[in-house]
Amino acid sequence: MFFACYCALRTNVKKYRYQDEDGPHDHSLPRLTHEVRGPELVHVSEKNLSQIENVHGYVLQSHISPLKASPAPIIVNTDTLDTIPYVNGTEIEYEFEEITLERGNSGLGFSIAGGTDNPHIGDDPGIFITKIIPGGAAAEDGRLRVNDCILRVNEVDVSEVSHSKAVEALKEAGSIVRLYVRRRRPILETVVEIKLFKGPKGLGFSIAGGVGNQHIPGDNSIYVTKIIDGGAAQKDGRLQVGDRLLMVNNYSLEEVTHEEAVAILKNTSDVVYLKVGKPTTIYMTDPYGPPDITHSYSPPMENHLLSGNNGTLEYKTSLPPISPGRYSPIPKHMLGEDDYTRPPEPVYSTVNKLCDKPASPRHYSPVECDKSFLLSTPYPHYHLGLLPDSDMTSHSQHSTATRQPSVTLQRAISLEGEPRKVVLHKGSTGLGFNIVGGEDGEGIFVSFILAGGPADLSGELQRGDQILSVNGIDLRGASHEQAAAALKGAGQTVTIIAQYQPEDYARFEAKIHDLREQMMNHSMSSGSGSLRTNQKRSLYVRAMFDYDKSKDSGLPSQGLSFKYGDILHVINASDDEWWQARRVTLDGDSEEMGVIPSKRRVERKERARLKTVKFNAKPGVIDSKGDIPGLGDDGYGTKTLRGQEDLILSYEPVTRQEINYTRPVIILGPMKDRINDDLISEFPDKFGSCVPHTTRPKRDYEVDGRDYHFVISREQMEKDIQEHKFIEAGQYNDNLYGTSVQSVRFVAERGKHCILDVSGNAIKRLQVAQLYPIAIFIKPKSLEPLMEMNKRLTEEQAKKTYDRAIKLEQEFGEYFTAIVQGDTLEDIYNQCKLVIEEQSGPFIWIPSKEKL
């Protein structure tokens, strides 16, 4: 058996995407002037956008309170432009803005990509915003957007500089940072119908997006991401990257999951009819410009929104609407890097909603409200109130989080005890509220409204509402479990009968508070149970499972979702059931804090589910999606190690350590050989091989120490193996081969990544040797992607490959640094590169000896 190991020159690993085509270089970037005239439309040339989706970014994060106001947007003097350029016969329009941010302890709160040495979009040397970090200065200010191009940092021109120069300018900008940015004007779409005839290559295009897998933040739509050469779409010529798929034959693709969209497209006949939304540039003149709510209080612009039968918005106007739930139909390669940690955005609920809050730069429609309609329509339980709104802002990187006064329709209940009807559309975060109650017939109450969720955006529910029924199911005497089940199984459109009962809820809340205090006091005095913050102020753990807060009906308050491998800072572990925690990012703790299930709760629920599996399923039965039959979908993606049924993976205590070597890399699972080969091929100066040992005699053309380390005797190598000097060894043709700890250390201490083609057992052996590897497990989603990525596989071979991967996860799951999944080899490859970059150090999280 041969044991290959690869090494790489240590640098700051950058993020890459394959480039399909480049556009011509843009030589007409305007220079900002200090002369500011009245607002004017500025037309600036833009090149064709390439397929580059992701290069590398520099992350700066900050938490600012309060924010300092910055000047009004700067409009470039159009006299400085001689002519109005065109792109393929189309005028491309930009707007320019000056944004002032105050740097906090952690930075500015955004990521960048691009530069003259590594263009982000085609040949454009600009520095582009690829990510707005929630809770940072940029997110709190609310004006900086993904895909903005930074032209100047304070007085430093960064319009045509290298990436490192831009990073340096941002680092040295001081505590008050003025950014001059350029962005495209808003985009609408035109709906067209396309008829395609399937050929040998099928329809010939790739898609991304869907509920729970958003391609554009806040948007559940399905987008075209690639046109395949020689396919039906390319031959037809009308479908393009960035188009939004609305319908396939008679099936709507609105609010469907990615898997549902794929299934609909696969189950089509030879002739396929597509309804497609194509982006169309529009020019917003001043009368329709978004209000500047950052600097001043704007008069209300009331929008009259009606809910059509298909759930879409209808505007009482002849102007085409802008979908409120979307930023823009720009393809993802214009929105910057993929963000695997970004939480899903909520879907807007528009039913029974008379007026919305004023438009913001993210959500704008120049439509006036028909006030006569409002006055004439009978709504017996509501009256209009123009009150300041501080809770309706969606917490996204494009939202305006500077809580300036704005006008919204506020619901007031004229008769406190009268039931009312509320209709919500489920989003990716569920319905956006929590419930309590259900004991001793006390009723089910709304205890928490998720900011930006469907309930919040509808304005129809509030804390203290009693839920009387859900889709006709009476909940007045229901238990908590019955109410949770009714809400979870209610479908996409949920009709709720609610009744505002503030006094009943206050009595219930007081009782819960007393019970919780008693439990906390008992827990603190008992000396047993989970680790407590009075015993240990700072507790860090690594999540060993996926947790989706939107699927956990038992949450006592706002939850915190996380993925396998995430580092969590547990702030309060004094409760046996729930812990308070923050997710730890590369820049420190994130601003978002929420509750997570305790170790005890996770393990108890998993054991209960394992008993159900043993009762309902045949031993060892795992379906083609990797799911164990009988498991409930409650947000806990926990795992049990094979052969160790008492060992349930929940949280692993970790400690932060600085390392002075470059971490080895072990990739396990299907396609690992192709990933290793691609890393070496694309980065030959960063990834290579280390030298294995063997007892085989040296051949004439071989050099000791270059081709192999030739061991003098078999006895000596067997002795070294017994003394744990090898991470893995085996026998081939009566000769021993192996990879020694010293060989790996030799590579690591010289600043090179060492990719090891070894089994999962080697991970633990490297950890014992104080060489903590980056262990990446490629987990197949199902048989179909395996067969798609390797056309030579038969279904039987794919099934065996899939089963081996599942067993591999069961055996070594506790040692993985990260688990990656993807539908294509390119997607998996890019995720692996991202993990390697993020986990390279010099500060890493390693297992601690602490016991939870």
Curated annotation (Swiss-Prot):
Pfam families for this protein: Guanylate_kin, MAGUK_N_PEST, PDZ, PDZ_assoc, SH3_1
Database matches in SMART domains: GuKc, MAGUK_N_PEST, PDZ, SH3
Modification(s) after translation: Palmitoylation of isoform 1 and isoform 2 is not required for targeting to postsynaptic density.
UniProt domain Guanylate kinase-like: residue ranges: 662-837
SUPFAM superfamilies for the chain: P-loop containing nucleoside triphosphate hydrolases, PDZ domain-like, SH3-domain
Broad class of where this protein is predominantly found: membrane
Entry-linked InterPro entries: DLG1-4_PDZ_assoc, DLG1-like, DLG1_PEST_dom, DLG2_SH3, GK/Ca_channel_bsu, Guanylate_kin-like_dom, Guanylate_kinase_CS, P-loop_NTPase
UniProt keyword annotations, A-Z: Cell membrane, Cell projection, Lipoprotein, Membrane, Palmitate, Phosphoprotein, Repeat, SH3 domain, Synapse
Modified residues (Phosphoserine): 28, 65, 307, 328, 360, 365, 406, 414, 528, 530, 553
Mode of membrane association: Lipid-anchor
Keyword Membrane: yes
SH3 domain mapped to chain residues: 536-606
Consequence of gene loss (knockout): Mice do not respond to persistent pain. Postsynaptic surface expression of NMDA receptors and NMDA receptor-mediated synaptic function are reduced in dorsal horn neurons of the spinal cord.
Modified residues (Phosphotyrosine): 58, 505, 732, 737
Domain PDZ: 98-185, 193-280, 421-502
GO molecular function: kinase binding; structural constituent of postsynaptic density
S-palmitoyl cysteine: lipidated positions: 5, 7
Entry's Gene Ontology BP terms: anterograde axonal protein transport; cellular response to potassium ion; chemical synaptic transmission; clustering of voltage-gated potassium channels; neurotransmitter receptor localization to postsynaptic specialization membrane; retrograde axonal protein transport; sensory perception of pain
Any single GO CC term annotated in Swiss-Prot or TrEMBL for this entry: postsynaptic membrane
Tissue/organ expression: Brain. Highest levels of isoform 1 in cortex, olfactory bulb, thalamus, hypothalamus, striatum and hippocampus. Highest level of isoform 2 in olfactory bulb. Reduced levels in cortex and hippocampus. Highest level of isoform 4 in spinal cord. Low levels of isoform 4, isoform 6, and isoform 7 in superior cervical ganglion.
Free-text comment on this protein's domains from its UniProt entry: Isoform 7 has an L27 domain close to N-terminus.
Cited PANTHER family: DISCS LARGE, DISKS LARGE HOMOLOG 2
Assembly, per entry: Interacts with NOS1/nNOS through second PDZ domain. Interacts with KCNJ2/Kir2.1 (via C-terminus) through one of its PDZ domains. Interacts with KCNJ4. Interacts with FRMPD4 (via C-terminus). Interacts through its PDZ domains with NETO1. Interacts with LRFN1, LRFN2 and LRFN4. Interacts with FASLG. Interacts with KCNJ4. Interacts with ADAM22. Interacts with DGKI (via PDZ-binding motif).
Protein name: Disks large homolog 2
